[in-house]
Regions:
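Class I S-adenosyl-L-methionine
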Residues: 1-146
Length: 146
């Protein structure tokens, strides 16, 4: 990992402890006028306080759909406390692993292109108009391993 990237990640990690983090994140998200927000393109939920803060940001940005992928299994017991506009998705840790029970929403990664439901590889690795990761009608999103 590049030193500049690592430094930025540590800065973000430290920032979640700041007392104004919820207010700042809420302002940033609401000011973008976006309808969809993905948490953590790198990293994961650090602890229960962090998860509670994310839930609060989602509550304070009710016009935005939040997608929160995680590999932190302990969060399962909190998934039913998530705000209505937040989809907490357990990402299966192994390639070709079936979706785990006990989760409202999951994501899997596989090597069989026929089982992949994510269209990004066919769209220049972009979501474009796909919103499956935010759509609560979709219980599992299957990504193609790359």
């Amino acid at each position: 990992m590049f030193k500049v990237v690592q430094a930025a990640q540590y800065k973000r990690l430290k920032a979640i402890r700041h007392p104004l983090w919820v207010k700042a994140m809420t302002m940033q998200i609401n000011s973008k006028k976006t309808k969809f927000f993905r948490w953590h393109d790198s990293g994961d939920i650090q602890d229960l306080k962090h998860l509670a803060k994310i839930f609060e940001v989602a509550r304070r940005s009710p016009d935005v759909q939040h997608w929160l992928p995680t590999r932190e299994a302990w969060t399962a017991k909190y998934q039913d406390r998530a705000p209505a506009n937040l989809k907490l998705i357990f990402s299966m840790p192994m390639v070709n692993q079936e979706a785990a029970g006990g989760w409202n929403y999951t994501s899997t990664v596989g090597t069989d292109p026929k089982k992949a439901t994510c269209p990004a590889p066919k769209q220049g690795n972009e979501c474009k108009s796909c919103r499956a990761c935010w759509d609560k009608k979709i219980k599992n999103v299957a990504y193609l391993a790359h």
